[in-house]
Amino acid sequence: MTPFRKLTSAETAALEALGNSAEDWSKVLVSEDFKPFQLLQSHLEGDVEIAAEARIVRSRVANYRIGTGSLVEGVTALECRRRSAFGNGVGVATMNECGGRTVKIFDRLSAQVAYVMAVYRHRPQTIAALEKMVDAYAEERSSEIGEVGSDCRIVGARFIREVRIGNGVEIDGASILENATLCDGARVGVDVKAYDLIAAEGSVIDNGSIVERCFVGESCRLDKGFTAAESLFFANSHCENGEAASIFAGPYTVSHHKSACSRSSTPAAARTRATTSSRAAPCTSRCTCAAASSPAAPTSCRPRSRAPSRWSWDTTPTTTTPRPSPTPI
């Protein structure tokens, strides 16, 4: 473990000269070879630990450990506000939206264990034993201080709250991440919103995807606005465009479905203009209505319900010859 020390008065003055501030500089611990230029225009709150070669630029950090060589830049809030298990032990209502087959997720969950917890409900002692082990593991992983691993890149994100971040993780432009664990090599992209999440090694969540109470397994990919809730995705699954609710997606599940609604390609304003112009079409030379002689008269002919054709250009009343009554026999 990297040894940490408190800041000297000279380092504190240098940090403030670079536009940095802290709620309490005495709670900030740094590595032995710390240099003041590692922080720029940032604000620190609570207990913060900064490892060697880590950088914090224009960000607010509260109660976090920043690992060796990691970059935190342009982050609205990287904070741990309370004691958290970082997504471990969260119940996911998979296969049954009413919660009859709830699986408690954790960062070492496998498809086999999840299957037993979801399907073998007729063995309550087995389920109780598994859930007890998961609860104990979640308590072991709980902490009041969040963690960013080594060689991570967190840029342009807004709110990252109660998230444990593994080594080599990349977060680029995420909107909000809350109560989650991102394992080694995971990637979270632009406009992603995630709550109560476990993202396993090498997983990717990108392009506006929304995830709530989900397990995203090793090398899985959720992309192009995919929305998922109460679902489990295991190794190498790939889902885009659509949505998932209470899904148990085994390894190599693929979904690229997107519902489409057909509509007219003509814009509403253009359709209105076309309708208006067709109703106000000028009368032709064949028309015998008042518009032919008076400019103030209506400039269009209207359909006649009793006309033999769709449009009547002759306004002469139509006379109908009554049929003779049948002769009684």
Question: Where are the language model's segments positioned?
Answer:
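Domain-scale signature associated with acetyltransferase and cell-envelope carbohydrate enzymes
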Residues: 1-246, 250-264, 268-269, 273-274, ...
